[in-house]
Regions:
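Short, non-ligating residues that shape and space the ligands of small metal-coordination modules
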Residues: 108-111, 126-127
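Processing junctions and N-termini across compartments
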Residues: 96, 111-114
């Protein structure tokens, strides 16, 4: 038993050392992202939270564990509820700021050429978060969001539109991460964005953009991500 414990301890230590090397390599800016995308974690809840760190650290792991007990392990129900929570958190506690990677320009210079910023999609905007996102109880957050929804949440062409689009995008990514158990790339690379479009009759509609890696989620994950977007 002692030998096994030492073996596990050595595995963790070696993994930490490898991650340090990888982070140093990524920091040089020769890759699309400046940090290692694959996080280390212990269980589904922890994996999902680490996977969603790009949405800003929050209490997702504890929420998943609580909801898993509440819904008797029904992962689809948990995914939908987590999507609602993350969407509400991003809308209520989020604020529009300049993208940290490009400084708000929407472009990244690499040597003699310029490319669209990967992090913000060329918009120059990103989302910052207030401290409440890490301390507010999720039930209180959902109640507050329900009150907010009694009046229009966004206006076309306004900052509230970008905030709402980003909040829905965050919710879809979070729900998909739970569905795929936090082990697939689909929530990171498969969901590109969410946007409000205008129909011919002037009514708004929601468009979710996907990329090739969404295929790793399988048909159920892909279909449920659209359902989650509709619910949000």
């Amino acid at each position: 038993m002692v030998a096994y414990a030492e073996y596990i301890k050595r595995l963790h230590a070696d993994a930490d050392a490898i991650y340090e090397i990888a982070e140093e390599a990524r920091s040089k800016g020769h890759d699309p992202r400046m940090s290692v995308e694959i996080p280390k974690a212990n269980d589904l809840a922890d994996r999902t939270q680490k996977l969603l760190d790009f949405l800003h650290p929050r209490q997702t792991a504890d929420q998943i564990r609580e909801l898993t007990k509440e819904y008797d392990g029904n992962r689809e129900r948990v995914a939908i509820e987590i999507a609602k929570i993350v969407c509400a958190e991003s809308y209520l506690y989020g604020e529009i700021v300049d993208c940290a990677d490009c400084g708000g320009s929407g472009e990244i210079k690499k040597g003699n050429w310029v490319s669209e910023c990967y992090s913000c999609g060329g918009s120059g905007n990103s989302m910052g978060f207030k401290d409440e996102i890490g301390i507010s109880a999720w039930r209180d957050t959902l109640s507050l969001f329900a009150e907010k929804k009694k009046s229009p949440l966004w206006k076309l062409g306004d900052d509230t539109q970008f905030l709402s689009e980003l909040a829905i995008y965050h919710g879809v990514c979070a729900g998909l991460a739970v569905l795929t158990e936090g082990i697939l790339v689909a929530p990171l690379e498969g969901v590109v964005s969410s946007r409000f479009l205008t129909n011919e009759d002037g009514s708004p509609s929601l468009a979710i953009s996907f990329a090739g890696p969404i295929r790793s989620a399988g048909g159920t994950g892909q279909a449920l991500s659209v359902l989650i977007a509709d619910i949000l």
